Amino acid sequence: MSQAHTPSAPLAEVYDVAVVGGGINGVGIAADAAGRGLSVFLCEQHDLAQHTSSASSKLIHGGLRYLEHYEFRLVREALAEREVLLAKAPHIVKPLRFVLPHRPHLRPAWMIRAGLFLYDHLGKREKLPASRGLRFTGSSPLKAEIRRGFEYSDCAVDDARLVVLNAISAREHGAHVHTRTRCVSARRSKGLWHLHLERSDGSLYSIRARALVNAAGPWVARFIQDDLKQKSPYGIRLIQGSHIIVPKLYEGEHAYILQNEDRRIVFAIPYLDRFTMIGTTDREYQGDPAKVAISEEETAYLLQVVNAHFKQQLAAADILHSFAGVRPLCDDESDEPSAITRDYTLSLSAGNGEPPLLSVFGGKLTTYRKLAESALTQLQPFFANLGPAWTAKAPLPGGEQMQSVEALTEQLANRYAWLDRELALRWARTYGTRVWRLLDGVNGEADLGEHLGGGLYAREVDYLCKHEWAQDAEDILWRRSKLGLFLSPSQQVRLGQYLQSEHPHRPRVHAA
């Protein structure tokens, strides 16, 4: 493939669609639109997936608890999307069994069985096994009084990589993707949108577009009010969700879904083979979405829920890492944060022949692809040349000709006998079949360059900077990879030094 780079957009260029926001919804819409033949520009004020999209529970799931709120349409769509995404991205999406311990005073067994029956049959389920009842023995990690439970299927995903892969797909279909670029203002003039943009170095430029998509996530309403000088058609409620990561709490590759006295649920999920991720919380958030952080109350809450279920008791000192994000949910006036709909709402503004503004409110990681299709359906009247929907069967980058992570790991081990098995597995899970591009021209370990710690080599860092918009250590350690837990503080400092030396400023990204 050619090494053509994404150029700085000249002032006079006109795009079909400009997308503001580099989270999962923004990149999903950009990829879908570009694949249908539209010229697309996307800007993200920080890094791809830097906020909400990398702070999720990292699940592709129907949302079992949404059935209690009668969200049947959302659950049906999400359940069907599990199978679609499992086929599109088998390297970053994997089946996961969930164990639900039964606590009779919270929900009776008949209610759980009924919910799981619906969950098994509401959506298309071909690859994932059905739910079943369980009996726990003395060897269970759960407390002795918890003797019965249920088990069902969903999927786990690397959330930030799902975003990056969609951005790569958009770029490979011709889209221009600009990170660290903020849309300062946008206005309609002479049938076009005029966007004024500011790079992280303070330089300014402008573009024009025939349609504007506001996928700014937590900033969606603020963008309409402050940057477009209009009234937002919907209110947004920012709901904080926080997670903690602790050393591996139990053996096995299954997750737990834990019921709490407040009728909320908390997940305990295997994380990077060595850890357990616990979350999430639900509470209103009023501050700057970019500065959200877990509170002491949330930490205590998560520990209390886990300690009510497991024999092994956790304390705050056991927490290795925490992360928090805000979910920008469409305000449906629900009393409780956990009851607010996770469904998405699209708002189209295009009166009197004006160029359209499409704003995205709400949504969840699992249904991003369907949201993007819905967005393109709304924009279709404005683009006579719009191609048909295409994303359902198209693999995401790295999912092409991919049998399984295990088979790809075996191929890597056979071709590169010197390659550490654990590293081969991580690369297969991270890059899928694109790993062959990462290793192009590599004949031995020396060709990987400096080992920066935790299985991270200079070769991979260079690849991420050149092909995946990475610019600083956080981009690499917490989003492109999840190696932040594996590098010591001094190794992280060395990575920063390497980036400053070898990649001091890389606003352009070459085609992969």
Swiss-Prot record:
FAD binds at residues 16-44. Its EC number is 1.1.5.3. Keywords: Cytoplasm, FAD, Flavoprotein, Glycerol metabolism, Oxidoreductase. GO terms for molecular function: glycerol-3-phosphate dehydrogenase (quinone) activity. It catalyses: a quinone + sn-glycerol 3-phosphate = dihydroxyacetone phosphate + a quinol. Its cofactor is FAD. Pfam families: DAO, DAO_C. PANTHER family: GLYCEROL-3-PHOSPHATE DEHYDROGENASE (PTHR11985), GLYCEROL-3-PHOSPHATE DEHYDROGENASE, MITOCHONDRIAL (PTHR11985:SF15). Belongs to the FAD-dependent glycerol-3-phosphate dehydrogenase family. This is Glycerol-3-phosphate dehydrogenase. The gene is glpD.
